[in-house]
Design a protein with these regions (language model features):
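Acetyl-CoA-dependent GNAT
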Residues: 3, 7-13, 17-82, 86-98, ...
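Well-formed, non-transmembrane alpha-helical positions, independent of function
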Residues: 15, 116-117
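A cross-domain feature marking catalytic cores of carbohydrate-active enzymes
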Residues: 63, 107-109
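A generic structural signal for beta-strand entry/edge sites
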Residues: 65-67, 102, 140
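Short glycine/proline-centered loop/turn elements that form peptide/ligand docking sites
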Residues: 89, 110-114, 131-136
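Conserved GNAT acetyl-CoA-binding A-motif
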Residues: 96-106
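Conserved catalytic-core motifs of GNAT/GCN5-like acyltransferases
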Residues: 104-106, 124-141
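Conserved active-site tyrosine of GNAT-family acetyltransferases
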Residues: 118, 123, 143
Length: 148
């Protein structure tokens, strides 16, 4: 099934929240957090990946003149490994490159698949945040990519 990327809308939140719960519980964002992010369209860029069955992934970027930050990215478990996460990340990086000279992100230290994707896209680890993800207490690896 073909997957298309488009801007996230408030109507996507039920599907995004269901994926968020499946992928990231107990360290999930809330509906109010996402609604707040979507209202800040001047500095936020959120996209979803969808096919005929609905939303299969999403990603978000916070972008300022001096730096951008990948705030979230996720792909349905049954669609992982198909390149959807890479397409979502590439969409965020294209937007980040228009706005900012550097992109930062935090990734769960135990998420080797995501760390590998970020490294393939030019990110390097620059630090670690102990017990960053709450309530699980999982560490985060801080990664950085400078615009080439």
């Amino acid at each position: 099934m073909s997957v298309e990327l488009r801007r996230m809308a408030a109507g996507d939140l039920p599907a995004v929240l269901a994926l968020e719960e499946d992928l990231f519980a107990p360290d999930t964002w809330t509906a109010s957090m996402y609604r707040d992010e979507l209202r800040r369209s001047d500095t936020r860029h959120y996209v979803v990946a969808e096919n005929a069955s609905g939303v299969v992934g999403w990603a978000g970027l916070i972008a300022y003149d001096d730096e951008a930050h990948v705030s979230t990215i996720g792909v349905a478990r049954d669609r992982q490994g198909e390149g959807i996460g890479a397409r979502l990340l590439d969409a965020l990086l294209a937007e980040a490159d228009r706005r900012s000279p550097v992109v930062l992100l935090e990734v769960r230290a135990d998420n080797e698949r995501a760390i590998g994707l970020y490294e393939r896209r030019g990110f390097t680890a620059i630090g670690r945040r102990p017990r960053y993800y709450q309530p699980s207490g999982t560490d985060a690896v801080v990664m950085k990519r400078e615009k080439s």
